Amino acid sequence: MSFSYSVKKELCSLITDRDKKYACLYGMLLFCKQFSRESIAFQTENDMAAELFSNLTDDVLGCKNAVAVTKSEKKNKAAVYLLTVDSQKDRDELIYRYHISNNNFHRIHKDVIDNNNIYTFLAGAFISCGSITEPIKEYHLEFVVSFSELAEDLLLLIQSLGISAKLTERKGASVIYLKESESIE
C-alpha cells in the first residue's frame, strides 16, 4: 500500500457531516476524470475513495445507487474502479446543486464552499487527482489537473490559505505542487 493510498484512506474516514460531504464531493467532481453535462466519471485505485464517491453522491442527491461501479484490473493486478453517474436526471441535479452553468464546469466557485470547509474541498480534490510522497523520502504533494483554468483556480485557492504552492506543466496537464513540510502538513 502506497503512502498516497494511506493518506487518501485517512481523508475518506474524516468526511462525516453534511457540509463536509457537500464540499468534498464538489472537490471530487471538479477534479475527476470526466465532469460535464454528458458524463460524470470518477476513476481510482483506492477502494475507500470509490466507496466515498458513491456514498457522497447518493447523500447529496438523496437517493440510493446513483453511481454505477465497474471494477477492472491493471496489468500489475491492481484494482481500478470506474464510477459513473449514468442518469441524466442525476447529473443535472448535481450540476444544479453546485451552481454550475454550461461554461463553468472547470472553474472553482468559492461561493459554493463554506469557508469552514475549504480544506474538505481540497481533500476531495486531492482524493481525485492528488498524490503525496512519504515524508521520510522527501516532502512532495501534487495535484495533476487536466484543465489549465481549473489548475489556476486551485493554485489561487491554496495560496489564499497562506500555503506556498507552484504550478508547472507536465505531459499536457497542469501540475500544482508543494514541497515544503510546513505547507504539506
Language-model features: where?
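N-terminal, positively charged regions that mediate nucleic acid binding
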Residues: M1-S39, Q43-F53, T57-D58
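DNA-contacting interfaces and partner/effector-binding or oligomerization modules
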Residues: T44, E51, L56-K77, L82-E185
